Amino acid sequence: MTDVLVLYYSSYGHVETMAAAVAQGAREAGARVAVRRVPELVPEAVAERAGYKQDQRAPVATVGELADYDAIIIGTPTRFGNMASQMKNFLDQTGGLWAEDRLVGKVGSVFTSTGSQHGGQETTIQSTHTVLLHLGMIVVGLPYSFKGQMRMDEITGGSPYGASTLADDGDGGDRQPSANELDGARFQGRHVAEIAAALVAGRKREAA
């Protein structure tokens, strides 16, 4: 069985919701899925005043466990077109894994959330891809076989780089991931799990 890690950071719950959909899609493809979050860096009192969602059920990940999975799907909100500092801090600790080639050949993928339609979804995903490539991972996106990313009848996230959602309703209020955005997240989870399973099976045949 293929092992998939959905590793995310979420301030207000939007990426957490997308992570659950990604995990569902990976399970539908037959993968064994773990959902983990990275540690929060914001002091608890500050996070509480800012309204952060602090009751997230996913266990906190450790850097060392990344090597245990065949695929890692990363979810992060955008911060000025880049990943959140919480995710960057976590990934910056993978130097030991990098030095030992522990993540080389594993599948990596990224999804995100932004506050606005043009808030840096693609640059956030692509800049995170850079880290995955340095770690030697095989980067997988959200192919156009997911037709939902081509919709023109509604404002929606999603691009060939990865699933995404918009967190602001345009009037400063909260917007939750739409049905189409969640469909994209599930599709990405299935797609990554299927590719990882094919790679694992191929390597087992070569080793036999």
From Swiss-Prot:
Chain residue ranges for the region called Disordered: 161-183
Top-rank EC class of the record's enzyme: oxidoreductase
Cofactor note: Binds 1 FMN per monomer.
Ligand binding (FMN): 10-15, 78-80, 113-119, 134
Positions with a binding annotation for NAD(+): Y12
Pfam families, per database record: FMN_red (PF03358)
MF terms (GO), sorted A to Z: flavin adenine dinucleotide binding; FMN binding; NAD binding; NADH:ubiquinone reductase (non-electrogenic) activity; NADP binding; NADPH dehydrogenase (quinone) activity
Protein EC: 1.6.5.2
GO cellular component: membrane
Reaction equations catalysed: a quinone + NADH + H(+) = a quinol + NAD(+); a quinone + NADPH + H(+) = a quinol + NADP(+)
Annotated substrate binding sites: W98
Residues covered by the Flavodoxin-like domain: 4-192
Required cofactor names: FMN
Gene3D superfamilies: 3.40.50.360
Residue intervals passing through the bilayer: none
UniProtKB keywords: Flavoprotein, FMN, NAD, NADP, Nucleotide-binding, Oxidoreductase, Plasmid
Record-linked HAMAP family: NQOR
Family the entry assigns: Belongs to the WrbA family.
PANTHER family: FLAVODOXIN-RELATED PROTEIN WRBA-RELATED, FLAVOPROTEIN-LIKE PROTEIN YCP4-RELATED
Protein name: NAD(P)H dehydrogenase (quinone)
Species: Paracoccus denitrificans (strain Pd 1222)
